[in-house]
Amino acid sequence: MDILTLGWVGLLGLFTYSIAMVVWGRHGM
């Protein structure tokens, strides 16, 4: 796997995780 691809996957995963935490926090989970 290319290092650039790995970086994008990591960044996208971190972004998705952050959104999920905010949504769950608002719903009181």
From Swiss-Prot:
Its main location: membrane. The keyword Thylakoid applies. Pfam families: PetN. GO terms for cellular component: cytochrome b6f complex; plasma membrane-derived thylakoid membrane. This is Cytochrome b6-f complex subunit 8. The chain crosses the membrane at residues 3-23. The 4 large subunits of the cytochrome b6-f complex are cytochrome b6, subunit IV (17 kDa polypeptide, PetD), cytochrome f and the Rieske protein, while the 4 small subunits are PetG, PetL, PetM and PetN. The complex functions as a dimer. Component of the cytochrome b6-f complex, which mediates electron transfer between photosystem II (PSII) and photosystem I (PSI), cyclic electron flow around PSI, and state transitions. One of its GO terms (biological process) is cytochrome complex assembly. One of its GO terms (molecular function) is electron transporter, transferring electrons within cytochrome b6/f complex of photosystem II activity. It is found in: Cellular thylakoid membrane. It comes from the Bacteria. The keyword Transcription does not apply. Keywords: Electron transport, Membrane, Photosynthesis, Thylakoid, Transmembrane, Transmembrane helix, Transport. Belongs to the PetN family. It is a single-pass membrane protein. It comes from Cyanothece sp. (strain PCC 7425 / ATCC 29141).
